[in-house]
A protein has these predicted regions:
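Helix-biased detector of long, well-ordered alpha-helical tracts
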Residues: 1-250
Length: 250
């Protein structure tokens, strides 16, 4: 469910609202090792107009064409602006879960962190596609699927979502921070809205994973226990007040 003013700016063009809502929903399918195929769409709107729905439809068509998916049904009602999307997908070789990380697994991200936040700040000016049109790593997912143990997409913040893998797998994590895998600074670890994949894999697969794409970064490893520890390049442990976005607090 995407609420105006919370999940997207209230003044956003309807075409961009549509594309972003579909992207963020389809990302969950990729995080489980699937490929998105179709979706249901429910819309509540306080002042529906033909112009708004024509622009919104343009966004749907653009996404559908880009990722070869289709709208198969839904609902429309009066109310505050809210876009609810339910995606369906087709499993690949492996269905990926959050509870399958193993001790000593490498931790990877499929692209750098911080682009979503940067795109939100600049959505009226520069780099708007980072926020408005998150790029779904469809082809990358196909190639990586056989090598992944556990996976999640980064929506609420890298450390927050990594914590969900750790909690489900009953493990901890050690992250070695580097500016090479963030757009701006340390806070990119917790800002969210990136919609990249965070995944773990056996060390024996490290070389082939890094050869699959230059955008993939190894950022740490899974450890015993339940703590998530972050170290800077001098091996000093870093601390955070929060690990990311909380829909019921933020």
């Amino acid at each position: 469910s995407n609420i105006s003013g919370q999940h997207f700016p209230a003044d956003l063009c309807p075409k961009d609202i549509a594309y972003r809502c579909l992207s963020t929903a389809a990302s969950d399918i990729l995080a489980m090792g699937g490929l998105p195929t179709s979706y249901l769409l429910s819309i509540s709107h306080p002042k529906p107009t033909d112009e708004w729905f024509n622009l919104f439809s343009d966004g749907l068509k653009s996404f559908n064409s880009r990722y070869d998916v289709e709208l198969t049904g839904g609902d429309l009602t009066f109310g505050d602006l809210n876009i609810a999307v339910c995606f369906f997908g087709k499993a690949q070789e492996k269905i990926l879960r959050r509870d399958s990380a193993c001790e000593d697994d490498d931790i990877f991200i499929s692209n750098i962190l911080g682009r979503g936040h940067h795109g939100l700040v600049n959505y009226k000016n520069l780099d708007q596609n980072f926020f408005l049109k998150p790029e779904l790593p469809i082809n990358l997912t196909k190639k990586l699927n056989p090598f992944i143990n556990a996976c999640i997409d980064v929506s609420d913040g890298f450390l927050k979502d990594l914590g969900r893998i750790c909690s489900a797998s009953k493990k901890g994590a050690e992250i070695n921070f580097s500016n090479s895998f963030v757009l701006s600074d340390l806070d990119d670890l917790i800002r969210g809205d990136d919609y990249v994949l965070c995944f773990t894999a056996h060390k024996k697969n490290r070389k082939i994973i890094l050869e699959i794409s230059k955008n993939v970064h190894r950022v740490g490893k899974i450890i015993s226990g339940d703590a998530i520890k972050v170290f800077d390049e001098s091996k000093k442990e870093l601390s955070f007040v929060d690990f990311g976005w909380d829909s019921f607090k933020n």
